[in-house]
From Swiss-Prot:
UniProt similarity note: Belongs to the exportin family.
Lineage: superkingdom: Eukaryota
PANTHER family with a match to the protein in the record: EXPORTIN-T (PTHR15952:SF11), EXPORTIN-T/LOS1 (PTHR15952)
Gene of this entry: los1
Protein task: tRNA nucleus export receptor which facilitates tRNA translocation across the nuclear pore complex. Involved in pre-tRNA splicing, probably by affecting the interaction of pre-tRNA with splicing endonuclease.
Protein name, entry field: Exportin-T
Keyword hit for RNA-binding: yes
Single GO term (MF): small GTPase binding
Length: 978
């Protein structure tokens, strides 16, 4: 490997005309240069021979040298570090960086920084003095800029709190900072000040800006008096008046204010800075939004500090408390001014101050009445918040769900809502009165404007209405408890629903209007006269027939929610609603690709359609048919009509290529539509209902579909879903078909589906109870074989591991349900007896899975249930030996080094183990005690005294007390304190 080889490799790697194979070889060569123990020498050679090699090659070499310098130890690699330092220092003294590209100069600065960190102070104690000497010898600003950028680079390395570092690195950085503070800090700050003064007089504001950056970056860890002194502060104040420097000066002031100090010291600092004079001059809207944002950040910093000082429990004299409050109150006008700013970046800059202030005022209001001036301030805050809550007059709503600007606005709204909520908690009467006025005046003003100019006001009024009663439930939300008069929320809702808002053409207004109707649907229990108009709105062109692609599918869901919420009142509008829904029940999903699926799939096709939202319409139809005032004949007719149409669509697809994606989509969508239609019907009771025949017929057709297309996982999933919904509707009518259904499902099942199948069978057991016992007995061998096979397979990546974990949980839960439902006897039948030992072993394996506390807990609970059912003299023959064999689980698993007894979930596991021991004792009594004393405890060398104490606790303490004892016992055992 030679220097020329490196240059050739860099050229090849960067040349767009070079083929991919050569380019990869070149990249690999550069990688080997960096990883090689001697590659740095070639890089050093290339850097030293400045004129011989191209800048791109030298950049790669500088980066490689930087990596090595960072890796090296300043003791074992001292010679190498000094060699590179000497070369870099020669480069700097020769002013070589003046005619270099900026990226080379930056790389040299970074390398110099890393050398400094390795060698300062013991092997390079004159670093700053030497560098300042070189800079002072030249009048060119480029030298000064180089020096200042090195200081900034040092600050990035040792004082950036956002960079995660090891404790060793933090300690090393602190040693460097201590050395700088002790040896060089005063000279550095003075040198930078002199540069700042000289270059500001020369109007070289670029270099002055770098000086300010250094002050801003370094002030957090240096003596504050080095910067906060009369000459320096006068200079900084003057920069606040210079357009080119005022933003940088603001940043420096902000960092000075942010410096961590004791409350009393910070208050004195803020008194010295006296920034209110500057704020008062900056109040008017400037022509520079960037400067306004910087001023807002400075106000925010001072406000946060003052609130913290005011809230600090440490004792301040009455005079200082008054001074702090005075400074804080003087900030209020500036807070409101910048909170109200037209630019969101400026407004959000004061959010932390506002948040802390409101929390402080809430605490204050809990112990005393707020003053009139503070209440006026809260009103001013609400006025500013409301201004920011509104869309700008010139702004249009972007209905693209991926719009970044819209997302940012909604995120800001969430934060503003928190401020509103806090003000409400401070003074609910003031808040309610103000918001009522704001909402009503917005609606009144909007009524005088054209639709294109009024939507922002109406949207604001509706949005505030939507969030106003969030969390309120029951009659108290709408009527005052004392005199039963309407609450403010009730008055607002009455105004909104009787206004002309519902006629507004803007899609966002239409959407919010429906959201309000759904959120406050219980309001119409008391205002039922409004329901006909609301139903008409929902089923009309502004609701479920909306032309807006974003509003329409949301309206389908909202109509479903509304109908479900007012089921009792909807009976009189069933036929008209069903008539308006008819044209929306045609399913049209075509094969489509997307970013996640370059080839069309069922999932990509569904994702890129409105089908999942359309399913709510099918459920809504079910709710309307079953809850309305239709005759049984009409109910049956509607059900037959819809189900026949969906089955017909599926059968049409079955008549051609079953593997064609469009046919799979058609069958899948038809099945899911039937399932969601069934969801709208109540669970079958004892009475006969008109729709039973329709759903029984549907179940027969679904079996035929499963028989034809059971090879497809998505179809199997749809059949499970739909069958589960139909079973809920038809009840025992479905029972004779269940064995065939389960048999077909199990024939083609894979691990992805096992969790769903277990859930499906659990649902059947819950519905059909003892009638499912024989069916479960027959299908259990196949099911267990599938489960054991899936759980024993090595996971092929993270997704497989997650699926296996989910299957473990479902499997344990399923077996526990069998026992809880009285199905435990099927585990001992002739068909299943052979699987009993593998089942027991699998549960014990899961109980010992250290690092999976949730799995352990449920597994141990299952074992406890088994012992409770089958242990003792009346239990199953031979189960006593198994019960005694559980003892190591109770004692040896918890002392595993990886079992964290301080973790909350692990303590729950210990609690389950304690419960297991109490159950074993209950079932075996003296047999268990004797086993512990004569067999187990001697085997593990338990001292006799400890064994005796343990048995006493086990025998005499109640379950709760023993759980606490056992948890402490295991913790002590692991720490060696027993």
């Amino acid at each position: 490997m030679s220097a020329q080889d490196v240059e050739n490799a860099v050229e090849a790697a960067l040349d767009p005309s070079v083929g991919p194979i050569i380019k990869q070889q070149a990249t690999d060569f550069i990688g080997s240069l960096r990883s090689s123990s001697t590659g740095w020498k070639i890089c050093h050679e290339i850097f030293s021979e400045k004129t011989k090699y191209k800048p791109s090659t030298r950049l790669i070499c500088l980066q490689t040298l930087s990596e090595k310098v960072r890796e090296w130890n300043n003791e074992s690699n001292l010679l190498e570090l000094q060699m590179i330092r000497d070369s870099v220092w020669s480069y700097i003294k020769e002013l070589s960086f003046l005619d270099e590209p900026a990226y080379i100069s930056n790389a040299v600065q970074h390398l110099l920084t890393l050398l400094f960190l390795q060698l300062y102070p013991s092997n390079w104690n004159d670093f700053f003095a030497s560098l300042q000497g070189v800079i002072a010898a030249s009048s060119q600003s480029e030298f000064s800029n180089f020096y200042l950028k090195v200081l900034l680079s040092i600050g990035d390395e040792i004082a950036d709190s956002l960079v995660l570092k090891t404790d060793v690195q933090i300690q090393k950085d602190n040693l460097v900072k201590d050395a700088i503070r002790a040896n060089d800090m005063s000279d550095i700050v003075s040198f930078v000040y002199e540069m700042m003064l000289a270059y500001s007089n020369a109007k070289n504001y670029g270099t002055v800006g770098l000086c300010l950056q250094v002050y801003a970056q370094w002030v957090s860890w240096i003596n504050i008096n080095l910067i906060v002194n009369e000459p320096c502060m006068n200079l900084l104040y003057s920069f606040l008046q210079i357009e080119e420097l005022r933003c940088a000066a603001c940043e420096t002031m902000t960092e000075i204010v942010n410096k961590k100090m004791k409350p009393l010291e910070k208050l004195n600092l803020l008194n010295i800075l006296n920034l209110n004079l500057f704020f008062s001059k900056s109040q008017e809207q400037s022509t520079d939004p960037n400067f306004d944002e910087h001023v807002a950040k400075l106000i925010n910093a001072q406000g946060v500090e003052l609130v913290a000082i005011k809230s600090d429990p440490s004792e301040l004299s009455p005079e200082l408390k008054e001074n702090c409050s005075f400074q804080l109150y003087n900030l209020f006008p500036y807070l409101i001014r910048y909170l109200s700013d037209d630019y969101d970046e400026t407004s959000t800059a004061v959010f932390p101050f506002l948040s802390d202030l409101l929390v402080s005022l809430r605490k204050e209001s809990s112990s005393k009445e707020l003053s009139a001036s503070l209440k006026e301030f809260l009103k001013s805050l609400l006025e500013a918040i409301i201004k920011k809550m509104k869309y700008d007059e010139s702004q249009e709503w972007d209905d693209d769900p991926d719009s970044e600007e819209e997302a940012e606005f909604q995120e800001m709204r969430k934060k503003l809502k928190i401020f509103q909520d806090t003000i409400n908690s401070i003074d609910s009467s003031l808040f309610s009165s103000y918001m009522y006025s704001a909402i009503t005046s917005s609606l009144s003003t909007a009524a005088t404007l054209s639709p294109e100019n009024s939507w922002q006001l109406i949207e604001f009024a509706l949005y505030e209405t939507y969030i106003f009663g969030e969390g309120l439930r029951g009659p108290d939300a709408f009527f005052n408890e004392v005199d039963k008069s309407p609450t403010v929320l009730s008055q607002i809702l009455a105004l909104v629903t009787t206004s002309q808002v519902c006629r507004h053409p803007h899609p966002l207004v239409q959407l919010l209007y429906m959201e309000i109707l759904v959120r406050y649907a219980s309001f119409f229990d008391y205002e039922s006269a409004a329901i006909p108009a609301l139903i008409e709105y929902f089923v009309g062109p502004r609701g479920i027939h909306n032309t807006n692609e974003r509003v329409r599918p949301r309206a389908w869901y909202l109509f479903y929610r509304f109908v479900k919420s007012i089921k009792k009142q909807v009976v009189n509008y069933t036929e008209s609603s069903l008539a308006m829904l008819g044209d929306l029940l045609n399913i049209s999903v075509s094969p489509v690709t997307d970013m996640d699926a370059p080839v069309p799939t069922l999932n990509s096709s569904i994702r890129n359609s409105d089908f999942n939202s359309q399913l709510y319409l099918f459920e809504t139809v079910g709710v309307l048919i079953s809850s309305g005032n239709l005759t049984p004949e009409e109910q049956a007719l509607y059900c037959d009509s819809l189900i026949n149409a969906l089955i017909g669509k599926a059968n049409a697809a079955l008549s051609s290529d079953l593997s064609a994606l469009e046919n799979i989509i058609s069958v899948y969508c038809s099945l899911m539509a039937i399932g969601n239609f069934a969801k709208g019907f109540p669970a079958r009771g004892s009475e006969e209902v008109a729709w039973l025949a329709s759903f029984n017929k549907a179940s027969d057709e679904i079996f035929l579909i499963l028989d034809r297309m059971g090879f497809n996982e998505d179809i199997r999933g749809a059949v499970r879903f739909t069958s589960g919904r139909i079973i809920n509707v038809v009840g025992p009518d479905m029972l004779p078909k269940v064995p065939q259904l389960i048999s077909i499902l199990l024939n083609s099942i894979d691990m992805n589906e096992l969790v769903d199948v277990l859930s499906f069978i659990s649902q059947l057991i819950h519905i059909y109870k003892d009638n499912m016992m024989e069916i479960t007995n027959r299908m259990l061998p196949t099911l267990l074989m599938r489960i054991f096979s899936s759980l024993s397979a090595a996971p092929q990546g993270t997704d497989d591991a997650v699926k296996q974990n989910d299957l473990r949980k479902s499997y344990i839960s399923f077996i526990l349900q069998l026992l809880n439902k009285g199905f435990g006897s099927i585990l001992f039948t002739e068909e299943n007896q052979v699987y009993f030992d593998p089942l027991i072993n699998s549960i014990l394996h899961f109980a010992n899975l250290v690092g999976e506390p949730a799995t352990q807990k449920s597994s141990i609970a299952l074992v406890s249930k088994m012992v409770s059912l089958w242990g003792g003299k009346d239990g199953i023959a031979g189960f006593e030996n198994f019960t005694l064999s559980l003892t190591p689980l109770c004692f040896e698993m918890p002392v595993n080094p990886n079992f964290n007894t301080r973790d909350g979930q692990s303590l729950v596991v210990l609690g389950e183990l304690a419960g297991l021991q109490k159950i074993i004792l209950e079932k075996l009594g003296d047999i268990y005690k004797s086993y512990l004393v004569t067999v187990y405890f001697p085997t593990v060398n338990f001292p006799d005294v400890m064994a005796s104490e343990y048995l006493q606790a086990l025998s005499n303490l109640d379950s709760r007390s023993f759980k606490q004892f056992f948890q402490k016992f295991i913790q002590a055992l692991k720490s060696g304190n027993v």
